[in-house]
Each structure stands twice: as C-alpha cells, then as structure tokens.
C-alpha cells in the first residue's frame, strides 16, 4: 500500500465553511474510486495549506488518479499547483474499525 500526501496553497481569505463545501462536492467522485482505500481531506487556514492524505493500493494508482485533470481541478478550485509525496505503508492500525492491515512482505 502507498500513502500519498497531496498539498496545495489555499486562496487568501478562504473560510472553513468554503473548504468543507469544496470537500463535500468531491465526495461522490472519490467514493466511486476502486483503487483508493481511504482519503482524509485536510486543511489549515493558519498556514494556508490544504490537501488530502490518501491510501492507495499502489503508487501507479495514485499517479493515474492524480493526473492532469486532477491538477486542473485543484488549479481551478484553489488557484495553486498541488504537490505530491509518496510513502510505502506496510502496516496500518485502525482503532475505529478495530482492524489491522499488514501487507505481505
């Protein structure tokens, strides 16, 4: 599994309510994604950063879904380019679901 962190700069003056509205609008698109395991939608108004933390089956899946059309959506919605970081994620402890995911070695 791969954890991907996507970050972008927020427009000046954006509100918490506006961020939540943007995130809610994107929910159906991500719910239908067969390659994504989990997504956390994040923002910090104080630092002016927003983005997402994704859990994918593979880095290829992450790159396929975060293509040019995704970049254009971020540019259109927030006026900034997204940046991407990828991390190998062999173990996940999910206390809410009382689940542990361990990738085979």
Segments (PLM) and residue ranges:
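A common structural junction motif
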Residues: 72-76
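Short S/T/G/P-rich N-terminal loop/turn motif that feeds into the first structured element of a domain
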Residues: 1-50, 59-68, 78-105
């Amino acid at each position: 599994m791969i954890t991907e962190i996507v970050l972008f700069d927020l427009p000046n003056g954006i509100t918490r309510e506006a961020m939540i509205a943007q995130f809610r609008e994107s929910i159906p698109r991500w719910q239908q994604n067969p390659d994504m395991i989990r997504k956390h939608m994040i923002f910090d108004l104080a630092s002016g950063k927003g983005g997402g933390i994704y859990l994918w089956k593979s880095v290829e899946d992450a790159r396929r879904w975060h293509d040019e059309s995704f970049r254009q959506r971020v540019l259109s919605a927030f006026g900034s380019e997204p940046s991407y970081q990828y991390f190998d994620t062999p173990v996940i402890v999910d206390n809410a679901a009382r689940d542990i995911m361990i990738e085979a070695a």
